[in-house]
C-alpha cells in the first residue's frame, strides 16, 4: 500500500478531536508505511476558533467585548493546540476547499475517513456548512481506496443520510 491520507477533524481546539486524530494517525500507520493527515480546514470551521471575528454587528461586538477578560487565555490555548498539531501530526499543506483536496489526492493510494463524527451534519463544525462539501462527498470521486474508520453519524435520520 502506498501513501495513505487521513481525512478527519484534527484542528478543533479541544482535547477530544486532537487526541482522536492522533490515535487515528497511529492506528492507520500500523497498516500503511506512510500516512498524512489531509489538513482540510474549511473557513467555516476556522471561524469558530478565530480570536478576532471579521463579521460585524452589535451582537458580535458585544460578544467580543465580553471575551476581552479571557483573551490572553484563549490566545494561549489556540497557540498550544497549533503547536500540538504541528508537532505530532504529519500534515499535508492546508486545504480550505474541496478543490484543494482534489488537487492533492493523487499522492494517495487510499484515503481513510474517520474517526469521530465526520458524517454528523449536526456537529458544531458542520451546522453552518454546505453539506455537499463535507467529508463523505469530498471523496465521492476519489479514484483510490476509500476507507471509513470508526466514523459516526450520531443521530442523523435516514432521510438525512440519503443526501
Predicted regions and their residues:
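Phosphate-coordination loops involved in phosphoryl transfer and adenosine-cofactor binding
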Residues: 1
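Aromatic- and Gly/Pro-rich donor/ligand-binding loops
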Residues: 4-15, 19-20, 24-162
